[in-house]
Amino acid sequence: MKWMIASDIHGSAYYCRELLAAFERESAQKLLLLGDVLYHGPRNDLPRDYAPKQVIEMLNGIKEKLLCVRGNCDTEVDQMELAFPILADYAILCEGTRVIYATHGHVYNEGKLPPLEKGDILLHGHTHVPKCVEHEDYLYINPGSVSIPKENSPHSYLILEEGKLTWKSLDGVPYMEYTL
């Protein structure tokens, strides 16, 4: 299965539209959103074209393709408007023999690990910085941010397909790869 993985839309209609265009272009079967879907939070500037109602409409239109975990900016009020679940703290995916623990990153992260077995993968957003770090017992992956990238990183997403991870800018240009 081909997964598109993205994080931190933060209510930007512009970047949500760009992400969904990339999702269609990539022909991925599922889109995993790692939280912070609608609200920008008090620590971030407003993203371009901040319009949460438009983001709701766009994402509800592809609800059957979405898997989402809760970010620190996501609330029960957001869930009342969205037609797909967003309040799970984590999701578990399997890629071959490896388990992927997908979460937002504000609770569990490199500094505070969830219960992982040797060889598992910790996947989270939250920092807005794309990463791929091989630790002794686990692999840490971050797709970066769709709308508010940090540390001079591009507006980005991640593709997971057949054991290969490819980080891409929203225009589809690959800039980092890793094979599991």
Language-model features, listed with the residues they occupy:
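Core catalytic region of metal-dependent phosphoesterases/phosphodiesterases
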Residues: 2-95
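Internal catalytic-core helix/loop-beta-alpha segment
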Residues: 83-131
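Binuclear metal-dependent phosphoesterase catalytic core
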Residues: 2, 92-96, 134-136, 140-180
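Active-site environment of divalent metal-dependent phosphoester hydrolases
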Residues: 10-14, 39-41, 72-79, 107-113, ...
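Hydrophobic/aromatic beta-strand patches that form the interior of the parallel beta-sheet core
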Residues: 32, 67-69, 121-123, 139-141, ...
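Thr-Gly-centered strand-to-loop micro-motif
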Residues: 6, 103, 142-143
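Alpha-helix C-terminal capping segments
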Residues: 59-62, 80-81, 113-118, 160
